[in-house]
Every structure is written in C-alpha cells, then in structure tokens.
Amino acid sequence: MYVYKRDGRKEPVQFDKITARISRLCYGLDPKHIDAVKVTQRIISGVYEGVTTIELDNLAAETCAYMTTVHPDYATLAARIAISNLHKQTTKQFSKVVEDLYRYVNAATGKPAPMISDDVYNIVMENKDKLNSAIVYDRDFQYSYFGFKTLERSYLLRINGQVAERPQHLIMRVALGIHGRDIEAALETYNLMSLKYFTHASPTLFNAGTPKPQMSSCFLVAMKEDSIEGIYDTLKECALISKTAGGIGLHIHNIRSTGSYIAGTNGTSNGLIPMIRVFNNTARYVDQGGNKRPGAFALYLEPWHADIFDFIDIRKNHGKEEIRARDLFPALWIPDLFMKRVEENGTWTLFSPTSAPGLSDCYGDEFEALYTRYEKEGRGKTIKAQKLWYSILEAQTETGTPFVVYKDACNRKSNQKNLGVIKSSNLCCEIVEYSAPDETAVCNLASVALPAFIETSEDGKTSTYNFKKLHEIAKVVTRNLNRVIDRNYYPVEEARKSNMRHRPIALGVQGLADTFMLLRLPFDSEEARLLNIQIFETIYHASMEASCELAQKDGPYETFQGSPASQGILQFDMWDQKPYGMWDWDTLRKDIMKHGVRNSLTMAPMPTASTSQILGYNECFEPVTSNMYSRRVLSGEFQVVNPYLLRDLVDLGIWDEGMKQYLITQNGSIQGLPNVPQELKDLYKTVWEISQKTIINMAADRSVYIDQSHSLNLFLRAPTMGKLTSMHFYGWKKGLKTGMYYLRTQAASAAIQFTIDQKIADQATENVADISNLKRPSYMPSSASYAASDFVPAAVTANATIPSLDSSSEASREASPAPTGSHSLTKGMAELNVQESKVEVPEVPAPTKNEEKAAPIVDDEETEFDIYNSKVIACAIDNPEACEMCSG
C-alpha cells in the first residue's frame, strides 16, 4: 500500500514510520495510558491505496480524538498531530503570510481582494524582523483538538479555500489590528492571548487587521419611528450591522398594535407580527460575515403592548405559520409594576403605544403613575395579570424564550442613567446601554480565562488563586477594548456616534466551573461562592482603575458629567451594598471623581460559546451541563468526557468501557455511583443537580460588581409553572437585571440507546476505587488585601464567613426589588425575621370561556399547589423541603 508525500513522491506505508511520528508528539503525556502503537494500528486499519500524508495526518488526529474517552491526553495528542499537519502546509514567517493575504487576487474575478488592511500591512513590513521573532509557534500545541478545529473552521484566514494562517498568526494579526503602531502594546497583547490569559470576542478575531475591521459584538438598535420610513430605515440598519458579524437587540415598544388607526391611509394596522416576519427574513438572508454565523436579532417588547400574546409565541413549533418568526428571539423588557400585579393576582392593562404614549420613555414611579393614569382613563384592555404570566411561562417551557430583563433594575442601576431611559438589552441579555433613533449602542467584548490564574505550590500539595495577576490582566483587557473603539469600522454612523460619545466596553469571563473543579471546590460550596465574589470584585476594580488611568491621559468620555460615577457612585453603591474589600475602593472613587473614567461601562459577562471552545474551558460562569457530551466536527461526532473527572476516575482505577457506557446512560451524571467518593460527587455535579437558587444567589453576588448585566441561563430538568414562577420571582427580588436569558430544559423522554450494552454499563458500579491514588492539591483561600493601609474593608474581612446559600437580605423579600438599606454580606438567614404572611398571592382563577386567550388545561390539584402559590413566590417558609426553590 502506497502513500503520496507532500512533494508528490510515492512511497510504501510504513508502520514504524507512523509510530515514530506519533511518539515524537507524545512528550509530556502520561506514558501509562498513551500508546503510540495502538494509535498506529487503528490508523492503518483506515488507510486506503493512494492516501496522501495530509490525509494520513487528518486520520491520525481523528483517531486520537475518538480515543479521548480512554484518557484526556489523547485529546492533546490529536491536537498536536492536527497542528503539526497545519504547520507543514502553511508558511512559517508571519510577515510572509501577511504579504500573501494582502496581495491575494480573487480567482473568479481576477481582481485584487486583499484580506489585510493597508495600515496593518505597512506596520508589519516596517517591523517584520521584530514581529517574526516575537512569535512562539510552540504555543499552537497548547490548543485542544476541538479548540483547534473551531479555529480552523471559522477563524483562520484562507487563500483559495486553503487555511493560510496559523493560530499564532491570527493572534498577532488581532494584536496589531487593535494597537496599530504601538508595537509594545501589540506584543503584550500577543503574549497574553497566546498564553491563554484572555481572548477577544469572535468579531474581533474574525475582522481585526482586515480592510473593514468591524470588531464589535453587540449593537442595540432603536426603532426610528412608527412609520413605513422608520421601520424600513431600521431594517436597513440591522442588515448592515448583521452583514459585518454584529448581533442585534432591537426595541419595538413604539410600534402600534393590531387594529390601530393609521391616519395617512385612513386604515388600520396589521400590528407587530407581519413587521417582525420581515425582520426574520432579513436575519436569515444577511448572515454574519459570509456564512460564519447566521444573522441574529433579539426583539424587546414591554408587556403592556397589546400584541404581547402573539409576540411571546413567535418561536413556537405549532400554530399558524404566518404568525411565527422562529429565527428571531423574543425578549421581555419587564417593569416592576407587572411583577407586582402578578404577585398580587391583580389586573393588567394592554395598550397600543398610539393610545398610551410615553410608557417606554419612563421607569419606576414615573412609569407607574403614567400607567395607572391611562388605566383609569380606560385607554386599554384589562386582563388578569396571571393570565399573561401563564402564557409567558408556557412559551418559555416550550421554546426557552422569551428572555426576561427587568426594565427598572436596568435603569435604576446604570451609569448611563444620565443619558435617558434605557429601552432594551442586546441579543444575549448582558449589554445594557442607552440607544435612540440617532444613537445605536455598541459594545466590544473580551473574556478573561479564569483557570489561568490558578497557581500550585512546588510540592504540589496546595493551590492558590492569583488575584493580583488577574487584576493586571483585566487592566490590559480594559485598555485593549478601549483601543478597539477607536480602531473599529462602524457599519452605520449611528453606531460610531454612540460609541465615541459613551465608550462602553464589556469584560467577561470563561472557565469559572473549570476553576472550581481545578481547585476542588464544589460549585455550590461556600468557598466557591466566596471565590466568585472575589473574582468579580477584582475584575471590576481593575477595569475601573484602568479606565480612570486612561481618562487621566485622554480625558473622560464625552457624557461623563452627570453620570453616577461623576458623583462617586459605583455599581455596588446602586445595589446599596458595600464591596467585599480586597481592593482600595476609597482611593479609586476619589480618583474617578477627580479625573473621570474613559468608559461609561466596563463589565458584562457574556456567553462565550465559541471562544471557550477555542481555549478549552466551560462557558462563561456556568456550571457544567454534563460530564459527557458529543462534539461534532466536519469529520464526524466525538464523545467527550469532562477531562477533570476522567483523570480522577483513571487515578481511582475505575475508568473502563463500562464506566463510559454508564455515563452515557446517566446523561453524564455520576451521582448514582456507589463506588465514587462523595467529594467527587459533590465536585462534579452538573447544572441539573445544582439548586437553581444557588445559581441565582451567585448571580446576585457577582452582579454587585457588574455595571451592565450578564447572560444568566436558568436550568430545569422538568419545568413546572411553580418552579418557573419561583425562580423568576426570586431573581427579581434579588435585584437582578437579567432575570433569564434562555430556559434550558431536558427532554421529557430519552431516545433509545441502541449502542449501549446495559450489562457492561452496570459493571461500572462494581469496580473498586483506590482512593489512595487520588492526590490533588488543596485550595488555600486568599487572605491578601490589596487595599491601602488606611482603608477599612466594608462588609467582611478576609477570614469572615460568607452567607449561607439560603441567606438573603430582608430587602430581597419585599415586593419591590430595590434594596431598602445597606447590609453586610455576612448577614445570614438566622438573623432575618421574615414573616411568611408578608406576601400573599391568590391562586390563579380558572380561565373562563369568554377570555380571548384561554390558558392550557392543567390538573386542578397541580394548579393549586404549583402555580403562583404564596410559598413558592415568597420562598420564606419554615419548612424548606416544601418549597420548590429550597428543595432544589
């Protein structure tokens, strides 16, 4: 059997030669479990006559990827083979690659089609020796196989369909695209990104250094006006933004409802849905950067709009096709008044914005006064508030949407409140910025890789978290994002105007779950909750400090005066809480009041779906969804096991084919294994096995340091109206801005697992674990304070205990989510004297025949116990086991 070499030569397939090549790439891997000969045997079985060496390397990489379930080091080996293959096919010198991309001529048209901007090309040519020598190609081998395949599929630039860039080339291109002629800053960014301390968001990786460097991820668009001209001008703006890889949040509160009078034609309006379908088709047609990602729009609507029932159902799988728009994402911009009416089982009135103008232009007490005035004047149609609430929950259970964002919390706790009323969030519910017909809000994103700051002692017995290093890196990311604002290509002038005036940025995180697992902290432990607080306090302080330093050099952003920050009010002040106290907030506050900040907003932890795949971590701040899952690439589907769990099971001596099949049957859960120590069961709980109350508590803890919001998904294995209501009201009373991004659920029934041998799977419970082999470093919590000596930490000291996971402030029990007084994070449940009778919510009345949109029929007993029960909503009862939230 013959193989064709890269130079066209033909030679016999040699077993020993393949084995030697694989062995050379096994450095640093576990020799007990990585067998180069076994890999070669599997490769040979798939070889065919006339295979090329490139195809042979691809086959070898895929073979190792399939063996990842044997040991996680096989994933590393797969990546090394794939990257070694890429290195053989691509030019090494960065400057030569840039030149090839710059001088690219389109084969179909014969015309020049440069993929690198003139500016970046000239910078590279002028500094090519310095840049070429700065690149460390060995860092390419630190990517996982699936991380590399993600880069290869969508991020690395191609010439005539062939990948031309290496991962290190991409990172240097991004660094130069951001910093231009500031070579030292570019090299700092290159080194930190290539060492995987942080990554910029996908649009920045796609477009930095290209002729049209649109590096922003998020755009918040305002409907220009309720007219044909206004609607179609807005549609064009959305198309231009989507064309350049931007995700869109669009508020449509001001569009008249179905049946409203149209003065210009003396007719009546068709309402929101036909217009929404036009936007739906635009999202389908205009993808993000040539099939890299589909176009994506989220539409925001307040629940008083008369078309609200049709709006929340647009993604449902059944119903009339002409009232569906399944490529858009509905989102609710909910005022506190609606939540109060649901809680009280009160009425709710629906209006057309033409008959009740101004409701979207105010919030808080002003909104309530205007809304109740319109109600008294009889301008709308009144329904039971819980009827609409039920329809919202029904849609969420079926489709995962609509998203829930709280209007009053977003406006009340924003540093942009001096600009006007904020009317929407973005596609992923983490960006909260002011937008107007002449200003499209923009945000540039980057995420810090949290596991990169774990340090293990020389003897391997203890591990610590380096907050000082995290602080330094977060400041670098802040400076980078601020630079992106100036170097960015803006698809529409409204976006340029807004971004230059207010200069918001968004720092996020990825790998929080990985950090907890590496430090051996269960996600729902008190230690993990404290670390969560410390991490976000550190990043917020770093971002504000860096922004203040930039303001001292370049001046504050244009609209700084009049903002809360200009008065010394920071995000935790708006929550009426004091910071944990690791950092010197008093000095920073004084500096901000004196010099200003360069950026109006700095924090917004976002979903990191693609970039966390690249770096090999779990998404953003979420727990793991499963300890075993499938990963699809072009060549097929691969089973992937949580690498931390897999190493532990291998060391315990109980990982085998039976254990693998057991995990598949249990959807990645190890909770039913009698031979696994309890500490591992606690450590490797999936999100389905963690109380959602814990998730919401941790979200509220970090929100004190998040001046925008964050993309908070909620997870319910089997959602019911009671559980959903309980979660929504708990999050609202905690003061969250984003109550829910997606609702994630599990299928009601599992597919038949034809490939599983149940007898083999059952043997997994019989293996005897050798706990003596499980030696891992223990976490040493940080007691360091980086505050000035005269700064007294508010709230808690480094050695203080933090609240139990069931604790909450008395303010969070009230009907209004606004905090009523300063309170310490150490206040526990025992200190509270909460009366169950504070909140009484009557049961949902049975739907009557003449109601326009009857609720689905449910069992009476389930309705009485499950829906809007006062105990479920208040969550303040003596017997936690009787509460849906407390019992998990």
Swiss-Prot record:
Enzyme class: oxidoreductase
Site note Interacts with thioredoxin/glutaredoxin, residues: 883, 886
Chain segments carrying region Disordered: 804-825, 839-861
Compositional bias per record (Low complexity), positions renumbered to this chain: 804-819
Entry binding sites for dTTP: 226-228, 243, 256, 263-264
Outcome (variant: residue 428 to A): Completely abolishes reductase activity
Glycyl lysine isopeptide (Lys-Gly) (interchain with G-Cter in ubiquitin) cross-link site: 387, 853
Gene3D superfamilies tied to this protein: 3.20.70.20
Residues at the site labelled Important for electron transfer: 741-742
A molecular function GO annotation: nucleotide binding
Descriptive protein name: Ribonucleoside-diphosphate reductase large chain 1
UniProt source species: Saccharomyces cerevisiae (strain ATCC 204508 / S288c)
Gene: RNR1
